[in-house]
Every structure is written in C-alpha cells, then in structure tokens.
Amino acid sequence: MAKINFTITKAKKEQICVKVLVSGPSGSGKSYSALRLATGIAGRVGEGTKIGYIGTEGMRDKLYANEFDYDLISLEEYSPDYYIAAIDAFLDAGYKVIIIDSMTHLWNWVQDQVQLQTKGDNTFQAWGKYKKENKKIIEKILLAPAHIIVTARGKDEYVLEANSRGKMAPRKVGVGAQQDKDIEYEYMVTWMIDQDTHLAEAVKDNTHIFEGKIQVLDEKSGEALYDWANDGDPVKSPAQR
C-alpha cells in the first residue's frame, strides 16, 4: 500500500449555521418556541432578515401570525422531496432563518410507505429504502446555508405524579422525537419541552449554553445560539483551503 500523506493543521472553530431540534408532546409549545428562537436569531443576523416557515399543520401554521413576522409555505404532501423543495424555495429567495414545523409528518410518511411496500412479514428492504429517503432531508437541513429550527412531536408516554391536590394523576411527557432512532443527535441542540409548564430541557447540547437549565425558550435563547454559532473564523471556500 502506498504511503498516505496528511496535512496537519491547528484546529480552529469556524462560523456555522444554527441547526436545532425542538420536540415535545402535543400542546407543549413547540411552534411558539421555534418562532421565538427564530425571531432572536433573525435579529442577530441583521435588520430586514426574514423568517421562512415550512408548515404541515394547515390552518395552525398561521396561529401566531399576529405575534411574529414570518412568511409561510404550507406543505400538502410530506415526502422528503416536498420538504427539500420548500427549503430550496426559501434559500433561493434569500431567507437566512427557516423553521420546519414539523418533521413528524415526514416520519409518518416514511412509515406509511413502508406499510404500502411491505410484502408479507419482510419489512427489512422497505425500511432500508425509505430510511434513506428520510436521511436525505436530514442532510439537506445540516448542509443548508441557513439557520434552521426543526420541530417534532415527542413519543408520548404517561407518568403518575402528584397533582396540586396531592393526588396521583397521569401526566403526558415526551420521551424523544417521533423520528428515526437517535435523530436528535444530528442537531447542535435538542430540547424536550414539558406539556404543562412549557419549560424546555436540553437533552443534547454542543454549545454548553443550555446544559443543566430548564427554561422557557425565547428570543434571548435564539440570540445566544446565533452568537455561539457565529463565534469563529469565517468559513473558507474550497478554493481557499
């Protein structure tokens, strides 16, 4: 085997785009939290920065239009190609901040396709095919030159806790996003939001800003994300490397 040569360089942090996941049970405040984060990021990017919102919830995509300034693409189909086309539409129009609300519909689409393609009990090939389709959108999000906030419904479970009257009562909690296994680890920060308190806990945090904190996600959180991501050397083009 011929000798392989490597170039050894000093590691330096480079500026990157924010890529985060907000998950939680239905009613926990994922969409609202995503809009607050996006508003904080957009303010840091600069005056006139527009927020693009890729929605899958029909009329619910417009619930907060009186509180936040954002432009909307409502998806009518939930295949990876539709998600990717919507991202490209915003990128081509110059948007620097994008919300995808939510990715759960994509995962439901994947599961539906597997069911349709399965013959007998052999789901292995179908899962292999459509998990690759699912991975396409993840790669698109991670490589897109824009700050992207993704939401996903949590895998709901119920726990018994004492209520305000001291009686044990069931409470719905999210235990990971309704997405492919370990998908939360693809993002810079992944939060799980509590349904009752709307408080978010970072279950994975590359920034170390949110570790050990349980808080409401707001514009200040978005500003902190942007500042961390923008702290570093400008990314060089391939020709400059």
Regions found by a protein language model. Give the residues of each.
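Conserved P-loop
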Residues: 2-97, 104-105, 109
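Phosphate-binding/switch region of NTP-binding enzymes
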Residues: 25, 139-223
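Glycine-rich, phosphate-binding/catalytic loops in enzymes
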Residues: 70-71, 114-118, 166-168
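Amphipathic alpha-helical transducer elements in NTP-driven molecular machines
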Residues: 31, 76-84, 97, 124-143, ...
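C-terminal regions of RecA-like/P-loop NTPase motor modules
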Residues: 1-6, 14-20, 27-28, 197-241
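An acidic- and aromatic-residue-enriched active-site/binding cleft used to recognize and process polar
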Residues: 56-58, 103, 153-154, 196
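Short, conserved acidic/polar surface loops in the N-terminal third of protein domains
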Residues: 65, 108-114, 160-162
